Amino acid sequence: MNYYKTHTCNELRKNDVEKEVTLSGWMYRKRDHGNLIFVDLRDFYGITQLVFNNDKDFFCKISDLKPESVITVTGIVKARTEDTINISISTGEIEVTVNNLQIESEVEFHHNEETAKEERSILASIADDQEYPENMRFKYRFLDLRREKVRNNIVLRSQIIAELRKFMIEQGFLEIQTPILTASSPEGARDYLVPSRLNPGKFYALPQAPQIFKQLLMISGFDKYFQIAPCFRDEDARADRSPGEFYQLDLEMSFVTQEDVFQVIESTLYKVFAKFSRKSVDKGFSRITYKEAMLKYGSDKPDLRNPLLISDVTEIFRDSEFNIFKSNIERGMVVRAIPAPKTAEEPRSFFDKKIEHTQKEFGAKGLGYITFNKDGTAKGPIAKFLDDNRLNHIREATNIKPGDSVFFASDKENEAATIAGKVRTLLGSELGLIDNNIFKFCWVVDFPYFVYDDKSKKIDFFHNPFSMPHGGLKDLEEKNPLDILAYQYDLVCNGIELSSGAIRNNKLDIMYKAFATAGYNKEEVNKKFGALVRAFRFGVPPHGGIAPGIDRIVMLLADAPNIREITCFPMNQQGEDVLMDAPSKVDNKHLRELSLKVVE
């Protein structure tokens, strides 16, 4: 028998009346009625109401005890009267009359009055379920986690990870841990470096992903690998990205095609989303090429809940009387159109605000609009420069109806696509077109293998350098590098990228040629990826994988506004752990041991 409890605070029911029980937990709420004090005792599992009578010698103790103190009580279960039943809690038909009280740990406020005031405020937020500034919540995260909503997110996270692990094992995957201290990798973000005491002047790197290790596992003969992998990238925070570290369901398989990877992920994620969400889950995982995604949605992370589709109307404006767009087109730019249903009768301020917002927030230029009124006429700053034939072509291209409007964005192709995508998202949200009660997945496939970097003035890898190009070595030798596609794919849900993956290159000559195209010679490749190069000389199976982000999956299923809400001990947006005061300075002795010196 447990010394501290016979039951949890969510366990007692009406059929337990007159039983003697022992409960332990935190004093959640206290109500003093003079001769009686009612206490809501809370543990991890729930709440039970306690009744303290003033004829007990510990009555004064409970009267003076501060909320969130930890107590153990023994008492008799009693049925509540009909008018005092609390249907909002599962133990609401009973209460426990306390015969014995033991104070396990009493709340003590800091001696500094300013700090004590802060502590009282955060304690009050637990009882009242108030929101407090994020930094205060994170500084007192051990208190913040006592709030039901916050705790439930962490419980949900644990349950989702357990379910993912179960599905992987059921499909024959082996869970294998790969090293945390490793070498720096070219994943695209900055590494977190760890100085080596035993090797002065040398550094480990925390893994941005287990990319090379999981490929080495396939070369080693393992067939299906997975792990709940911690990944570390020195990146700025966003709503869907934590600074520093994140977790992913990392997996890799041998002798597979792209379709085999899709089948595993679609089956797994559909089951997880269907189990843990009240929203409907679209069973169809759409396939969209990268080129199509950028054209129709203005993003490689398309939100398919938004029905608006972007159209290319460059040819309609070519040689038109609207000189701004005409001039842009002559200089190699494009024009994209974004429909705005049922907005033709909106005042001019509606359109001006959208354009002003897009210019201010996204640095957009070359914006305009046309309204197509119900009587068939077209109005707006651009309409007067277009003849009826061009206006009809715009109607057809954008599939709009009388009473709709169209926004336009003109710029270089990539910039115009991005701005059009931002406008599409803005309109979808403000016009109430997005269904918030559904999860819609899509695969974005056929990414470019290479991209031209305007800053470095050179060709570089668009995504993962270890993926297989379409057409293999032949395309690398014969095609324009910017026309080569890769067997790379992203999984997107409701406009959030859940995962990236690829079918890997398994041939050494293709690896060397791909890196040569991006400006790396053999010596550089051998030095940077020595382990992989050595392994590639000893039989490499065709293999591929993917790594869905755990944090983003949980964020979506918890309907949380950002990743910090589903992380147990998160950093703030400045990459600071205000609870543990990290990052922090270290003393000179420690620095000397690591052969380091801080340069101010």
UniProtKB/Swiss-Prot annotation:
Coiled coil: none
A molecular function GO annotation: ATP binding
Marked site (Important for tRNA non-discrimination) residue numbers: H33
Gene Ontology CC, one term: cytoplasm
InterPro entries: Aa-tRNA-synt_II, aa-tRNA-synth_II, aa-tRNA-synth_II/BPL/LPL, Asp-tRNA-ligase_1, Asp-tRNA-ligase_1_N, Asp/Asn-tRNA-synth_IIb, AspRS_core, GAD-like_sf
Stretch list, region Aspartate: 211-214
PROSITE patterns: AA_TRNA_LIGASE_II
Major site of localization recorded for this protein: cytoplasm
A Pfam family assignment: tRNA_anti-codon
Binding site for ATP: R233, D234, E235, E497, G549, I550, D551, R552
UniProt: L-aspartate binding residues: E187, R233, H463, R504
Catalytic reaction(s) noted: tRNA(Asx) + L-aspartate + ATP = L-aspartyl-tRNA(Asx) + AMP + diphosphate
Keywords: Aminoacyl-tRNA synthetase, ATP-binding, Cytoplasm, Ligase, Nucleotide-binding, Protein biosynthesis
Alphabetical GO biological process terms: aspartyl-tRNA aminoacylation
Subcellular location as annotated: Cytoplasm
SUBUNIT field: Homodimer.
Protein family according to the UniProt entry: Belongs to the class-II aminoacyl-tRNA synthetase family. Type 1 subfamily.
Function: Aspartyl-tRNA synthetase with relaxed tRNA specificity since it is able to aspartylate not only its cognate tRNA(Asp) but also tRNA(Asn). Reaction proceeds in two steps: L-aspartate is first activated by ATP to form Asp-AMP and then transferred to the acceptor end of tRNA(Asp/Asn).
Entry protein name: Aspartate--tRNA(Asp/Asn) ligase
Organism the protein comes from: Wolbachia sp. subsp. Brugia malayi (strain TRS)
Primary gene name: aspS
